[in-house]
Amino acid sequence: MADISIDPIVQRPRRLRRTPAIRRMVAETRLDPADLVLPMFAVEGLTEPREIATMPGVWQHTKESLQKAVHDAADAGVGAVMLFGTPLERDPIGSQAWNPHGILANAVRWAVEAEPELPVIADVCLDEFTDHGHCGVLAPDGTVDNDATLPLYAKMSVVLADAGAAMLGPSGMMDGQIAVIRKALDDAGHTDTVLMAYSAKYASGFFGPFREAVDSQLKGDRRAYQQDPANAIESLREIELDLEQGADFVMVKPAMAYLDVLAAARAISNVPVAAYVVSGEYSMIEFAAKAGALDRKRCIMEALTSVKRAGASTIVTYWATEVAIWLNEVRS
């Protein structure tokens, strides 16, 4: 067989992949502990922390366990914590959401007490507090009444800001929610409270394990107010509206299944863009790793890097503390 001659190859991209040191030097995307936000669940009446069966490694917290987890997150350099609360009593309007001594307001105070310098983000939504599990109050026909819900979000937001939340995450996907909350906060003197708007929140099957985490009472689904997974352009409209209304952040949720939306959000936004790696995205990696199907650490890092590469400046993830520790080990 005759020798095959090839012309000299001048362009060799593999040169920049040859060693770990070179790969680190030319990496286009870098995770930092401060990029990460740790979501946490406080449960009223709990006497000891309880692991969530569908989210291995994630816990429902008591005051003591929450404060320890907040300390651990701060020590690792995590950027913030995000709090959700589950009350003992629920009613049709979710009145425990704006109880100044309710579980979520208390959890905010516990976190601030534990680490005064660590930003605390409080979720603003009624779904954990209503006996029907929807994100707002219901009209007589069973649909969520958008305009009747907005004043309740406003009351809830002021209570949480009073409790010490530096940031609020309005997640209910009600039209006009950012404007109403911003005005209520400003009128109450909380002009510096940051709004992290859940601008592009999809009616996703990946939220499944979260429902166990907050003991959801959901009846039906949320497709009439959360976004259709088939749509992307609609998200850009939602983002633009939230920015007009005073959002300081915008968010895409879920993250991994919506990287195209995240990239588009980054392209049109002049504020930080957050993305939430949700419970189902977390659990599918955890259970696949437990079954031996993949390398857990490698896939976690790849997943979070992909979210940052797509445009997220802030990533909400249940792996926040663990990943921050890994990142610190690499640097030391």
Swiss-Prot record:
It comes from the Bacteria. InterPro entries: ALAD, ALAD_AS, Aldolase_TIM. One of its GO terms (molecular function) is zinc ion binding. Its EC number is 4.2.1.24. Pfam families: ALAD. One of its GO terms (cellular component) is cytosol. The keyword Transport does not apply. Mg(2+) binds at E238. It catalyses: 2 5-aminolevulinate = porphobilinogen + 2 H2O + H(+). PROSITE patterns: D_ALA_DEHYDRATASE (PS00169). Pathway: Porphyrin-containing compound metabolism; protoporphyrin-IX biosynthesis; coproporphyrinogen-III from 5-aminolevulinate: step 1/4. 5-aminolevulinate 1 binds at R211, R222. Homooctamer. Catalyzes an early step in the biosynthesis of tetrapyrroles. Binds two molecules of 5-aminolevulinate per subunit, each at a distinct site, and catalyzes their condensation to form porphobilinogen. Belongs to the ALAD family. This is Delta-aminolevulinic acid dehydratase. It comes from Propionibacterium freudenreichii subsp. freudenreichii.
